[in-house]
Amino acid sequence: MVQIPENPLILVDGSSYLYRAYHAFPPLTNSAGEPTGAMYGVLNMLRSLIMQYQPTHAAVVFDAKGKTFRDELFEHYKSHRPPMPDDLRAQIEPLHAMVKAMGLPLLAVSGVEADDVIGTLAREAEKVGRPVLISTGDKDMAQLVTPNITLINTMTNTILGPDEVVNKYGVPPELIIDFLALMGDSSDNIPGVPGVGEKTAQALLQGLGGLDTLYAEPEKIAGLTFRGAKTMAGKLAQNKDVAYLSYKLATIKTDVELELTCEQLEVQQPIADELLGLFKKYEFKRWTADVESGKWLQAKGAKPAAKPQETVVIDESPSEPAAALSYENYVTILDDVTLESWIEKLKKAPVFAFDTETDSLDNIAANLVGLSFAIEPGVAAYVPVAHDYLDAPDQISRQRALELLKPLLEDEKVRKVGQNLKYDRGVLQNYGIELRGIAFDTMLESYILNSVAGRHDMDSLSDRWLKHKTITFEDIAGKGKNQLTFNQIALEEAGRYAAEDADVTLQLHLKMWPELQQHKGPLNVFENIEMPLVPVLSRVERNGVKIDPAVLHKHSEEITLRLAELEKKAHDIAGEAFNLSSTKQLQTILFEKQGIKPLKKTPGGAPSTSEEVLEELALDYPLPKVILEYRGLAKLKSTYTDKLPLMINPKTGRVHTSYHQAVTATGRLSSTDPNLQNIPVRNEEGRRIRQAFIAPEDYLIVSADYSQIELRIMAHLSRDKGLLTAFAEGKDIHRATAAEVFGLPLDSVTGEQRRSAKAINFGLIYGMSAFGLSRQLNIPRKEAQKYMDLYFERYPGVLEYMERTRAQAKEQGYVETLEGRRLYLPDIKSSNAARRAGAERAAINAPMQGTAADIIKRAMIAVDAWLQAEQPRVRMIMQVHDELVFEVHKDDLDAVAKRIHQLMENCTRIDVPLLVEVGSGENWDQAH
């Protein structure tokens, strides 16, 4: 692995940072409507880099305005790129001012690109013996790498020295230009040689050498072993001019005339009064407070600035990154005395992080192999209890370790933090330990801060927040069929890995928690919804649900027969046999042999046979309709009727789904193994699957389902008098809407008119256009638009809400639920019209869907609290969409159903009544 020498010259590709930040961070604005997201992102990245390496010399280099020498060489150079978005352009000048106020030299040289300036400074520094660290995400910079010049990509925390360049690109740094010249570079519109891709370019360069050698000895190319080698010499000959033009375009200049030398790029102390003014103007409130309190952490060796300044610490960066993640203060505990000593330390800590190590991802089946703890950054311990490889040292027995730890783990007053603690709670339950004092979960902290900012697993969060690449499980256990389980891993490696998990978790919490505390709404959601939900979901998962395999087996046999009938029908329509599961064969049948006009194409250019396309084609052609039914049944068979019996846990005789709190953008729960959300709701096949979810003897399944909850939330949010009145009076909302839209008395509304009104009601929740409504109702677009216009005339509050929400989303970059959950919309200001329109639709729907998610989560918490206190033999067994499902003893049915109904309808207050429909039966279908 590359070691970064002390105090390197840091050269930052500012233009690369700018675009990356613009696309990676939410489109934030200040109260004046000025965009700030890219500025915030660049400063975040710069700050982390400078504070991690603390250089005495650095520069941030941007592209200058105007054309460069490459534009003169090739008129199409970068010509495919869209113009810089206005909201990004507006941030450049203030960003430059902030970079300078941070004390960092800033360069932009006309006629060349930032890469050329960086290349020149890097080579100059190398000549005088100074190590260089270039921060960039651009692959063409790899040509500059030497033993003294290293690249770092702060977005992925990847560091490239000469060996890493070879591993990544297949060629050494000195052949990167040749590599790009041959294969081209689509990001810069460098053409390359037609027909030469990455693999071919690697084969040519590895086999013979650079471009000059290839053209000097073309006869040797045919002797290489890659596919197409025999004709490659001819292709190269035909495109020699293009190859050498591409070579020139890809070459980074290292002889740009500069007014400054690398030794003059000294990092100065921040100019606090300038930073303060800029931070206040653009409303970087936390940074403003840091400047005012004098906490800006300067780089070591910084020279005094010409103006008075204060020092600022930005709390998202690790205070001592090198020490905090050095592993020096990690211990492996092998005896009772040391463990008891650590338990005392853990009791006294304001909060400690802990993690379990096991031999399975299934927490019910998992065996505990060890536990790790961290009490402060960089101070962590691992307690192995079941490593059983040959010559493994003696360890504290699992029984003894848990006996010592149980009082601590069950103490409600001792606050704990973890990453996905629901899993660890489940593991400990296998050994009779009820984990209490669950105060924080870093996965949920990240999710609540921004659900769409990226993945919320520990490795990703460590990269993003700590700029630290964690030890991965594959690093210590290997891959594939020979991968070890954790109990087989040597303690030296296992201890470091496990202790790091706890250490990183604690450090992540210390970084994210102050950020979360600054936002009242998200903090409320975290403290009062997501964290209390963790033990509730853990209980629901452990309860599981009883499945009748015989029902599923019979259903599967029937589906098999129906699939055979559909296959024959499809063959008859097509006039020949073909594989209905083969996309390629289906494309041939539909679009070539039947002559149907393709509606869409795949990214690869082939005609699409997606479900959406087939649904549209099915309106006019019989075969797509058959294919859709075949696909739907085949998926049900493979996902549910065949698979569910295999998921029955041999220990419990039940199926235990896993619920995920940190997956969807809106706050909805998702589930896997099995995915309960995808069981069809309104067709016979879905009903048949639900019939296999059964109650044990003397029990019944009880289903409690919120009725039309998102429409009710729409009424509350829009404050539309017509909708509020209809719900308050308990009217059939779809019939009431039809009466308003069509100008009829309620009792004159036909079934068809009610269906149209229902499509409008639910369509508007999801931002449906007139075109979408016309397709759904199979009516002309003008007629659909007329329906929508009539709707908005009758319910003007809904239109006002939609317009208001779109405007707020564009201004803030996010929308909120009633509880304060923030739902960020990165594409709300996208220059891509389709992506922008999608974000606008999401802006309308997200507050409703997110509020519905918050409501059912509050209901789960309220019902669970009652069950734990008063009804221990009632089990909550599933949560699906807006529905909670229970197992209730027959003797308790009436009282329990009534209380669940009350708790769910009153768990939150909105301006229309929440309506819960409760049913019961021997199986889920009967109860639903």
Swiss-Prot record:
Question: Which reactions does this protein catalyse?
Answer: DNA(n) + a 2'-deoxyribonucleoside 5'-triphosphate = DNA(n+1) + diphosphate
Matches recorded under PROSITE patterns = DNA_POLYMERASE_A
The record, for CDD domains, names: DNA_pol_A_pol_I_C (cd08637), DNA_polA_I_Ecoli_like_exo (cd06139), H3TH_53EXO (cd09898), PIN_53EXO (cd09859)
Would you say which domain of life the source belongs to? Bacteria
UniProt xrefs under InterPro entries: 3'-5'_exonuclease_dom (IPR002562), 5-3_exonucl_a-hlix_arch_N (IPR020046), 5-3_exonuclease (IPR002421), 5-3_exonuclease_C_sf (IPR036279), DNA-dir_DNA_pol_A_CS (IPR019760), DNA-dir_DNA_pol_A_palm_dom (IPR001098), DNA/RNA_pol_sf (IPR043502), DNA_polI_H3TH (IPR020045)
User: What are the protein's UniProt keywords?
Assistant: DNA damage, DNA repair, DNA replication, DNA-binding, DNA-directed DNA polymerase, Exonuclease, Hydrolase, Nuclease, Nucleotidyltransferase, Transferase
Indicate yes or no for the key word rRNA-binding. Answer: no
- What SUPFAM superfamilies does its record include? 5' to 3' exonuclease, C-terminal subdomain (SSF47807), DNA/RNA polymerases (SSF56672), PIN domain-like (SSF88723), Ribonuclease H-like (SSF53098)
Annotated region Klenow fragment: where?
Answer: 324-928
Report the residue ranges that make up the 3'-5' exonuclease domain in this protein: 324-517
Q: Which residues form the 5'-3' exonuclease domain?
A: 1-323
Its Enzyme Commission number(s) read 2.7.7.7
Q: Pfam families in the record, alphabetically?
A: 5_3_exonuc, 5_3_exonuc_N, DNA_pol_A, DNA_pol_A_exo1
* GO molecular function per UniProt: 3'-5' exonuclease activity; 5'-3' exonuclease activity; DNA binding; DNA-directed DNA polymerase activity
SMART domains, per the entry: 35EXOc (SM00474), 53EXOc (SM00475), HhH2 (SM00279), POLAc (SM00482)
Sorted alphabetically, the Gene Ontology BP terms of this entry are: DNA-templated DNA replication; double-strand break repair
Q: What PANTHER family does this protein's entry cite?
A: DNA POLYMERASE I (PTHR10133), DNA POLYMERASE NU (PTHR10133:SF27)
Name the protein family: Belongs to the DNA polymerase type-A family.
Q: What does this protein do?
A: In addition to polymerase activity, this DNA polymerase exhibits 3'-5' and 5'-3' exonuclease activity. It is able to utilize nicked circular duplex DNA as a template and can unwind the parental DNA strand from its template.
Q: Report the protein name in the record.
A: DNA polymerase I
**What species is given as this protein's source?**
Salmonella typhimurium (strain LT2 / SGSC1412 / ATCC 700720)
